[in-house]
A protein has these predicted regions:
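Conserved protein-kinase catalytic-loop segment immediately C-terminal to the catalytic Asp
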Residues: 54, 105, 167-170
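Conserved metal-phosphate-binding beta-hairpin within the catalytic cores
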Residues: 154-171
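Short glycine-enriched loops at secondary-structure junctions
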Residues: 12-16, 117-120, 167-170
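A structural micro-motif
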Residues: 6-7, 29-32, 51-52, 86-88, ...
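Conserved N-proximal alpha/beta basic substrate-recognition cap immediately N-terminal to
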Residues: 1-42
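Phosphate-binding site of ATP-dependent enzymes
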Residues: 40-41, 48-52, 59-146, 154
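A structural signal for short, well-ordered beta-strand segments and their strand-loop junctions
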Residues: 7-11, 36, 54-56, 89, ...
Length: 171
């Protein structure tokens, strides 16, 4: 406890040791094609293969500093981004994001609920803090299966309260 009035839910060491983007490395089979890198060359190769990518800082959160690139994006643009953010996660862009993602809430290893987050018009970022809109949703059997796999692992690692995001059956 920080004070008599503040209770800490998640183990602080577990939170420190598991930044959300890096934690996902254990679940690459559930994700769209993804690389973790600080190399412009690696991102260029990845871009050549997948044409459209989203790049996120490995320690980013809240839908901030997300970069969309396509085949016409310059090497200089990527380099400038890497100079600012260093280590990044690059993923094949999923156009289904225009229809939103699902934020799934997990407490004590149990799936407690979900919301669908819809990006504001013209955006690929669905986070509510970045202008996204929350709407009621349910999970498909496959979404539930994916969430269950992650929920079980989070419980083993002493993360009591967490949210995970799915876009079109991908973590």
């Amino acid at each position: 406890k920080i004070s008599n009035k503040t209770q800490i839910i998640n183990d602080p060491l577990a939170v420190r040791n598991m930044p959300e983007k890096l934690y996902s490395i254990d679940f690459l089979k559930l994700m769209p094609p993804t690389i973790f890198t600080r190399s412009v060359h690696e991102i260029e190769k990845f871009k050549k293969k997948y044409k459209k990518l989203v790049i996120k800082p490995t320690h980013g959160y809240g839908g901030k500093n997300i970069l969309f690139i396509n085949k016409s994006s310059s090497r200089a643009k990527i380099s400038k981004y890497l100079n600012k953010h260093h280590h990044v996660m690059a993923q094949k862009f999923l156009p289904q994001i225009k229809d939103g993602d699902k934020r799934i809430f997990i407490i004590g290893g149990i799936i407690k609920g979900a919301i669908k987050r819809i990006p504001k018009k013209g955006s690929i970022v669905s986070n509510i803090g970045q202008g996204g809109k929350a709407v009621k949703t349910t999970l498909t059997k496959n979404e539930y299966r994916i969430a269950k796999v992650v929920a079980s692992d989070l419980k083993k690692k002493h993360i009591i309260f967490a949210g995970i995001d799915l876009i079109s059956n991908y973590l």
